[in-house]
């Protein structure tokens, strides 16, 4: 431990550092000081000392809640004058904080978000309607309209109160008073003597503004009490809720403070977020185009559904990147609980204040790279790769923003609708000017919006989500197997999931019961099964699961032996370090102490496709439970499709491209890359790109494949159909939306919408067995449902539903039932093997054609996409799209950065693009860093792809080429990792000097072998352990200097 003195900027006598603060832009002034002084500095003002932190290294430590807790900064103490001990302005040790937190958590669960969705849409539609009615010469004052929108949203969702801001020329009086009060709270920070009589008028206005806010809130409360209304909103929870720990309700004064808190925090930060997001979009047209394309592709209904909003992944990434650059709540304050040393260098005394300067944290180059000022949403493609505590726009731990999911759902919905309905023009070439109060906003930001003339639908009623649920009845022939569904839930998501499971269980003939985990601490039944659904809360069990977890931790093996169970975990990967901690603990501890796990644990992420993951786990779980208890349960969730089919005479009118947001274009060239005499085929295709498409080295071409003629003929033969026959499909289920519903298509065209070669699923097997009239054949099909048989006979052999239908003609499944059970066809992704620096309107791909004897033993297997592409010739049409992979698989910005590229076989594809780019840069006079390409194949006389190009690049000094041949006569098999091992010392030297490392190709054997070789070389060169070498490689990847583009098999 080396103790250091904390840096401090220049002082000015008694005023200390105070004159350095720009009174209008204090946060930006502090950021400038941080740029000069580094990751920590001390800032003194009369009567107080604050230590500002900027690096993830120190902030990670300061976020340890056992050593530091939320501090009420001086600014928050001033806000406390009107927000009292509300959630945001209370100390953690205050009784009302814990009480309110417990009572209000369910109001921000995933289930609650579904209830708020229709109300959010109500306000969002008002915004769209306002902008639709603007004249062509009128502009939009973005922060002002975003403030109207977010205030109206929290008013309606939280308190069923309509501010009607879009029907006012001036802001609502509450907004005027709130903004003025927040300004005054911040301005007090700049005053050396706040009690100076010169500020008496400010004090008078401050008190008047507080009265305006209190009067409105008191009216909202009084009106609700008088009406007797029981809406499922924040206000009802406040008025009726009781703390589950103490049984105490909130008093009226605290309810007032909570409402003011939510009216401020619930709209100020979100309006700033939306304003910044739109600013960054108009300044980055390529990002705007990508986000708008996603909105158009996903939001296909006139009014977005809750599920569609959850599917706006790129829009969510845009919002996160806006929060990274300008987090609208730009700081949070902590204090040391005891004397301690921060970072092993800076001593702190008990009570010392720390301030996390979030915009600086989000610009830590050791985490985010050198391009921290660039707006690049792709940083958030893989949130789990972002180091812990590197991204903190919502605060920390138990004091993090309770409304995070509310804010992000609202912002995603609104931004998605804006992008769907409007094109935006930055007609003033606006330069960013950030206004600071307690939050940040771009001041004076205006744009013009041109309507895309897409009609709006009606606003859904708040009960839409609930009314859409199926009412399940008890099974007619119930087997009554006991099923206890236990839950641990603070926010309601786990409880709702548990009750859903119990509802389904009843329809399947079980005798279900639902209870909290705590109610069965020390009392788990041995009869029947136990399903456990629980969340984690900052790594701790929910309030109604604490006793159970404590009991389980100390329980003996005798207390759980004989219990048959499965666990489903609810979580949120935004809290990566504690994600699934409690569900995993329960599952692993029960198993370790002798309980029997009858279905694998499920894990669902609230920030991703929670429902999709839950449904997938649920399907497998019911199958496993039925197999364990030898039950013949009705699969009422999956097999009863309402898909109807009628034969008609009409041509197909729905292009496949529309389903996937792709474009149709021409093949410019197609040639074979394997040498004559080779038994295999690798095709090089060059694709013409439309003017709106662009790409960079390392991108993928997503291809919409077509099922080949042979497999289509097998389907039509099995069902006795003519491939040219025209049909029309009708269905109501959302899960069938991938089909061309209410359209007229041929049987052949319909079969291009579905996957025909996926392994048969358990759902499909059960459906086939139910339709099989030959008892021995039905037994054979049902036998495949057994866990080991399914693994060995279905998954390992990739046995398909079509193959089984051909084997068992006694299965009387209808063609419509067959189609309804098939998944949507999936795009296949190929690394682009060219550089746009050579031709920006042409891209090439390198395709290994897959064919051979089917693992299932039923004839020949042909890869759908590779064989489709192999048959394309110059002038043929292809449906495809550009996709940027999630990894940092692109050339470094600095051409002098050394490169190490490993790409055997078709894995060389992206590196061909890299080589072309480097050649162009060299011809432009750029100095290039070393570049080493490790390429492997069977033989230089058989499958040396792009041999002439690569050898020419080496002779021109573009790359150093290292080759490995695995099928040379009288020579041992040599793979790329063997050649790398010989160069180990050189490779580690390059990586120590800042080289970037890339792997492309087989991810099942080649990539792990290459990684193992590289880690061994690092350990040998630096004399460190295997664990240290693995950590080094992981850190290399986290820093964006190691990227993989690999696939299985």
Curated annotation (Swiss-Prot):
Consequence recorded when altering residue 265 to C: No effective fatty acid oxidation. No effect on electron transport from NADPH to FMN
Site feature Important for catalytic activity, where: 269
InterPro entries registered for this protein in UniProt: Bifunctional_P450_P450_red, CysJ-like_FAD-binding, Cyt_P450, Cyt_P450_CS, Cyt_P450_sf, FAD-bd_FR_type, Flavdoxin-like, Flavodoxin/NO_synth
Main location, first listed in the record: cytoplasm
Mutagenesis / variant outcome for changing residue 83 to F: 800-fold binding affinity for laurate as substrate. High coupling of NADPH consumption to laurate formation. Very much more effective in indole hydroxylation. Favors omega-2 hydroxylation
Subcellular location field: Cytoplasm
Effect of residue 75 to G: Higher activity in the hydroxylation of highly branched fatty acids
Cofactor(s) needed: FAD; FMN; heme
Application notes: This protein is a target of protein engineering. Its selectivity-directing and activity-enhancing mutations have been extensively studied and the designed mutations allow this enzyme to act on non-native substrates and/or in order to enhance production of synthetically desirable end-products.
Consequence of changing residue 83 to I: No effect in binding affinity for laurate as substrate. High coupling of NADPH consumption to laurate formation. No indole hydroxylation. Favors omega-2 hydroxylation
Outcome following mutation: residue 265 to M: No effective fatty acid oxidation. No effect on electron transport from NADPH to FMN. Slightly lower high-spin conversion with arachidonate, palmitoleate, palmitate, myristate and laurate/dodecanoate
Binding sites annotated in the UniProt record for heme: 401
Region described as NADPH--P450 reductase: spans on this chain: 473-1049
Effect annotated for changing residue 269 to A: Contrary to wild-type, significant decrease in the formation of the high-spin complex via substrate binding, and decreased substrate-induced reduction potential shift with saturating concentrations of arachidonate
Binding site for (9Z)-hexadecenoate: 52
Flavodoxin-like domain boundaries: 483-622
Outcome when changing residue 265 to Q: No effective fatty acid oxidation. No effect on electron transport from NADPH to FMN. Nearly wild-type level of high-spin conversion with laurate/dodecanoate, palmitoleate and arachidonate
Keyword field: Cytoplasm, Electron transport, FAD, Flavoprotein, FMN, Heme, Iron, Metal-binding, Monooxygenase, Multifunctional enzyme, NADP, Oxidoreductase, Transport
Segments for region (Cytochrome P450): 2-472
Record entry for activity regulation: Inhibited by N-(12-imidazolyl-dodecanoyl)-L-leucine.
Listed name of the protein: Bifunctional cytochrome P450/NADPH--P450 reductase
């Amino acid at each position: 431990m080396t103790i250091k003195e904390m840096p401090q900027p220049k002082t000015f006598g008694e005023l200390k550092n105070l004159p350095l603060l720009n009174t209008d832009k204090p946060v930006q002034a502090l950021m400038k000081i941080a740029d000069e002084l580094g990751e920590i500095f001390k800032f003194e003002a009369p009567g107080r000392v604050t230590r500002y932190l900027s690096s993830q290294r120190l902030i990670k430590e300061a976020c340890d809640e056992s050593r530091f807790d939320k501090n009420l900064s001086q600014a928050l103490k001033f806000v406390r004058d009107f927000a009292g001990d509300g959630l945001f302005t209370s100390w953690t040790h205050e009784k009302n904080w814990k009480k309110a937190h417990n009572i209000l958590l369910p109001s921000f669960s995933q289930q609650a978000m579904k209830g708020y969705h229709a109300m959010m849409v109500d306000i969002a539609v008002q915004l769209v309607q306002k902008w639709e009615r603007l004249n062509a010469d009128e502009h939009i004052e973005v922060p002002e309209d975003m403030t109207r929108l977010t205030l109206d949203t929290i008013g309606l969702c939280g308190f069923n109160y309509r501010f009607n801001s879009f029907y006012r020329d001036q802001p609502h009086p509450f907004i005027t008073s709130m903004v003025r009060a927040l300004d005054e709270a911040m301005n007090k920070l700049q005053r050396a003597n706040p009690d100076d009589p010169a500020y008496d008028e400010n004090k008078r206005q401050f008190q008047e503004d507080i009265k305006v806010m209190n009067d409105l809130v008191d009216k909202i409360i009084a009106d609700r009490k008088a009406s007797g209304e029981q809406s499922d909103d924040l206000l009802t929870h406040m008025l009726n809720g009781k703390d589950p720990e103490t049984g105490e309700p909130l008093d009226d004064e605290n309810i007032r403070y909570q409402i003011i808190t939510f009216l401020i925090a619930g709209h100020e930060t979100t309006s700033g977020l939306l304003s910044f997001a739109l600013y960054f979009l108009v300044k980055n047209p390529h990002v705007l185009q990508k986000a708008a394309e996603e909105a158009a592709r996903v939001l296909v209904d006139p009014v977005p559904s809750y599920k569609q909003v959850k599917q706006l992944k790129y829009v969510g990434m845009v919002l996160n990147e806006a929060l990274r650059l300008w987090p609208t709540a730009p700081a949070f304050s902590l204090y040391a609980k005891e004397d301690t040393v921060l970072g092993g260098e800076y001593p702190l005394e008990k009570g010392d204040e720390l301030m996390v300067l979030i915009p600086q944290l989000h610009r830590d180059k050791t985490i985010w790279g050198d391009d921290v000022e660039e707006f690049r949403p792709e940083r958030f493609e893989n949130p789990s790769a972002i180091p812990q505590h590197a991204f903190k726009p919502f605060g920390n731990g138990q004091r993090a923003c309770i409304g995070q999911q509310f804010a992000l759902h609202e912002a995603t919905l609104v931004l998605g609708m804006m992008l769907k309905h409007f094109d935006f023009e930055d007609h003033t070439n606006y330069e960013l000017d950030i206004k600071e109060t307690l939050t940040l906003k771009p001041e004076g930001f205006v744009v013009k919006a041109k309507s895309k003339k897409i009609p709006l639908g009606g606003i859904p009623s708040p009960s839409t989500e609930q009314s859409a649920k199926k009412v399940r009845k008890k099974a007619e022939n119930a087997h009554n197997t006991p099923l206890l569904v236990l839950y641990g839930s603070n926010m309601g998501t786990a409880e709702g999931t548990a009750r859903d499971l119990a509802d389904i269980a009843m329809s399947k003939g079980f005798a279900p019961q639902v209870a909290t985990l705590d109610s069965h601490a020390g009392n788990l039944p041995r009869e029947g099964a136990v399903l456990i659904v629980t969340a984690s809360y900052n790594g701790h069990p929910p309030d109604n699961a604490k006793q159970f977890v404590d009991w389980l931790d100390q329980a003996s093996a005798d207390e759980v032996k004989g219990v048959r169970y499965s666990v489903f975990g609810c979580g949120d990967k935004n809290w990566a370090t504690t994600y699934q901690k409690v569900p995993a603990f329960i599952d692993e501890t029960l198993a370790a102490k002798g309980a029997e796990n009858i279905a694998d644990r499920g894990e669902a992420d609230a920030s991703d496709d929670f429902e999709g993951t839950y449904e997938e786990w649920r399907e497998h779980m019911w199958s496993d439970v039925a197999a364990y208890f030898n039950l013949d349960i009705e699969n009422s969730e999956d097999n009863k499709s309402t898909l109807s089919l009628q034969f008609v005479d009409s041509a197909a009118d729905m292009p496949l491209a529309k389903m996937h947001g792709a474009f149709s274009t021409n093949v410019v060239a197609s040639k074979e890359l394997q040498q004559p005499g080779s038994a295999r085929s690798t095709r090089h295709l060059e694709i013409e790109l439309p003017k709106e498409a662009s790409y960079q080295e390392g991108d993928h071409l997503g291809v919409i494949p077509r099922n080949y003629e042979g497999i289509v003929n097998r389907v039509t033969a099995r069902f006795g159909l003519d491939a040219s026959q025209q049909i029309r499909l009708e269905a109501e289920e959302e899960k069938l939306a991938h089909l061309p519903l209410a359209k007229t298509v041929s049987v052949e065209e319909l079969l291009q919408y579905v996957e025909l070669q996926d392994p048969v699923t358990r759902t499909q097997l059960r459906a086939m067995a139910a339709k099989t009239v030959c008892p021995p054949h039905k037994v054979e099909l049902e036998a495949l449902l057994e866990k080991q048989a399914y693994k060995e006979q279905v998954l390992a052999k990739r046995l398909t539903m079509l193959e089984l239908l051909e084997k068992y003609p006694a299965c009387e499944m209808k063609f419509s039932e067959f189609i309804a059970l098939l998944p949507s066809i999936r795009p296949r992704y190929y690394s682009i093997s060219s550089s746009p620096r050579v031709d920006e309107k042409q891209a090439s791909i390198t395709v290994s054609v897959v064919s051979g004897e089917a693992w299932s033993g039923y004839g020949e297997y042909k890869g759908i996409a590779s064989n489709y592409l192999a048959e394309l010739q110059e002038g043929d049409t292809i449906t495809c799209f550009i996709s940027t992979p999630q990894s940092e698989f692109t050339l470094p910005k600095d051409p002098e950065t050394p490169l190490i590229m490993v790409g055997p076989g078709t894995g060389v594809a992206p590196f061909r693009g890299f080589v072309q780019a480097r050649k162009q840069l060299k011809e432009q006079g750029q100095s290039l860093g070393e570049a080493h390409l490790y390429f492997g194949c069977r033989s230089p006389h058989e499958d040396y792809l792009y041999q002439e190009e690569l050898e020419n690049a080496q002779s021109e000094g573009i790359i150093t080429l290292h080759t490995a041949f695995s099928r040379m006569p009288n020579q041992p098999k040599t793979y790329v990792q063997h050649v790398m091992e010989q160069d180990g010392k050189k490779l580690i030297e390059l990586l120590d000097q800042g080289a970037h490392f890339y792997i492309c190709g087989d991810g099942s054997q080649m990539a792990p072998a290459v990684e193992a070789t590289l880690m061994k070389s690092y350990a040998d060169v630096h004399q460190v352990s295997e664990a240290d070498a693995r950590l080094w490689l992981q850190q290399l990847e986290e820093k964006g200097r190691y990227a993989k583009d690999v696939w299985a098999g």
